[in-house]
Regions:
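N-terminal Rossmann-like FAD-binding beta1-loop-alpha1 element of flavoenzymes
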Residues: 10-34
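FAD-site-proximal beta/loop scaffold in flavoenzymes
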Residues: 160-172, 177, 181-190, 339-383
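An anion/pyrophosphate-binding glycine-rich loop and adjacent beta-alpha core
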Residues: 228, 234-341, 346, 398, ...
Length: 531
């Protein structure tokens, strides 16, 4: 078949805040391909309810306070240079978002209406109602569509990045100077894999929470960029730090899970087990108001000990009208499932929410592979360390997009397209039975990760996950070599790679720190604190 070869100065894989803001910042100097595996509205950015953290109210707040809050949340293993960079550059990037048409809520006096979230010492979260992410995403989409130099490829799915490996050179983890020449991208309309050649490639593919059964993320979050870079022998770091939201609505069959906000516990919600007993007093003096990771661990422990798959959140003691006024969306959603939250307990369970680790990058957003940058949730800048401070993620994406854009523009002229890249080998077919097996394997990955590499870990559980994933890996690689590339098989392959990375890096961290908690090493180790 006649396969397409497309050439762009910049190839951006992923279309959330990270990918789109990078594209907008470089498009005046060259052509940009924006690869988007679903529609532009399916990005994780769109679903970010909370807001975006930035010091704006200098009367009470300052950079030092925001830096300190971030370091404390990260359990002291954040990279101080990354923390300082994001926080000190945040205000100028907020201005850029406003220039692109983002509306942040203001008070009557014209100042920003700021929220305060767990772990922040001051009010510093800019927001747009309770759907900040959607406001940012839709504003960026408008800007991107208007820009003549940006071409959006919707329903195109990146399969592999192209390196010297594809020129027949042996590449290992120790090869110096691995270079990225573009990517092989599946056109879902034609079913063919096209070759995209670029001078600069950017990974902005988001997180990998869909490897867990319970997740608050859209199901496109399969860790594609992280897996592609890992297979190309790039460096991936801190994958053991997965943030779980303690209270997602438990309704089997609902994927992704509906988020029951923190604010509900602040409002006076009480956690109970299925025998209606309160249990937080066993775990923390702050009860239901303890920090996210403590509450998530307590719920997890309660469920595992009792062999149950959820707990209850109870606001029935509060004034019904007050409850409806404060939480109209939650009230409506629960009512549609036959739960009246003013009279009934809300079934909740923790769900995978955010990945702190990812593709290791420097202060310019460069990965360990030359000509390849990584931005947003798929990258690991060192900002989050062992745990992310609320609302620090959207701001990290745009600050690093800005640095990466400046760096990429300064080196663009050094590079050319590599014309020697072979076409993708497009042989193979797939039967319906094999499709069913792929779906089944995905469910198995979800169950392995949920049961053995969840909130509370142990050596025994991690070894078990490792062995199970190994079997799935062998089966899937054999299938992948035989069949034609499809989004399903590629996503499965990526999920297995990412599950393996989370498991292996969890095994290597022989301590409990940040979001990584293991019963075999329940305390932080002294050595790491000094690093």
């Amino acid at each position: 078949p006649n396969l397409m070869i497309r050439k762009f100065d910049f190839l951006v894989i992923g279309s959330g805040i990270a990918g789109m803001s990078f594209a907008l910042k470089v498009a005046h100097k060259g052509s940009v391909a924006l690869i988007c595996k679903a529609g532009l509205e399916e990005a994780n950015t769109y679903y970010a309810q909370g807001g975006i953290a930035s010091v704006t109210n200098l009367k009470v707040d300052n950079f030092e306070k925001h830096i300190h809050d971030t370091m404390v949340a990260g359990d002291w293993i954040s990279d101080p240079a990354a923390v300082e960079k994001v926080i000190c550059n945040a205000p100028s990037q907020i201005e850029e978002l406003i220039k692109w048409g983002v509306n942040f809520d203001k008070k009557d006096n014209g100042e920003f209406d700021l929220h305060k979230e767990g772990g922040h010492s001051e009010f510093r979260i800019l927001h747009h109602k309770d759907n900040t992410g959607a406001e940012i995403q839709t504003s960026l989409i408008e800007e991107v569509k208007r820009h003549p130099n940006i071409t959006v490829f919707s329903n195109f799915y990146a399969v592999e990045i192209i390196t010297q490996h594809h020129l027949g050179i042996i590449v290992t983890r120790h090869t110096p100077g691995i270079k990225c020449f573009g990517a092989y991208v599946l056109n879902e309309k034609t079913g063919e894999v096209d070759t995209f050649l670029s001078k600069i490639t950017v990974m902005a593919t988001g997180g990998c929470e869909a490897v867990y059964t319970h997740t608050t993320n859209p199901l496109v979050a399969t860790g594609d960029g992280i897996a592609m870079v890992y297979r190309a022998k790039g460096v991936v770091k801190d994958m053991e730090f997965i943030q779980f939201h303690p209270t997602a609505l438990y309704h089997p069959g609902d994927r992704p899970s509906f988020l029951i906000t923190e604010a509900m516990r602040g409002y006076g919600g009480v956690l109970r087990n299925l025998s209606s007993e309160e249990f937080m007093q066993k775990y923390d003096p702050r009860l239901s108001l303890a920090p996210r990771d403590i509450v998530a661990r307590a719920i997890d422990n309660e469920m595992k000990q009792r062999g149950e798959d959820h707990v209850y959140l109870d606001v029935t003691h509060k004034d019904p009208e007050e409850t409806k006024k404060h939480f109209p969306n939650i009230y409506k959603k629960c009512l549609s499932l036959g739960i009246d939250i003013t009279k009934d307990y809300i079934p909740v369970a923790p769900a995978a929410h955010y990945l702190c680790g990812g593709i290791k990058v420097d202060l310019d957003g460069q990965s360990s592979i030359k000509r390849l940058y990584a931005l947003g949730e798929c990258s690991c800048t060192g900002l989050h360390g062992g745990n992310r401070l609320a609302s620090n993620s959207l701001i990290e994406a745009i600050v690093y997009a800005d640095s990466a854009a400046k760096h990429a523009l300064s080196v663009l002229d050094r590079y050319d397209f590599n014309e020697d890249i072979p076409e993708w080998n497009a042989e193979g077919t797939i039967s319906n039975e094999e499709r069913i097996l792929i779906t089944q394997s995905m469910k198995e990955v979800n169950q392995i990760m949920e049961s053995y590499v969840g909130i509370v870990r142990s050596n025994l559980r991690l070894v078990r996950a490792w062995n199970r994933l190994d079997i799935l890996y062998e089966e899937t690689e054999r299938l992948f070599k035989r069949v034609k590339a499809s989004r399903e098989i590629c996503e499965l392959r990526n999920m297995i790679n990412v599950g393996y990375l989370i498991t292996r890096q969890a095994m290597e961290r022989k301590e409990s720190r940040g979001l990584h908690y293991t019963i075999d090493y329940p305390h932080p180790s002294k050595d790491n604190a000094e690093k």
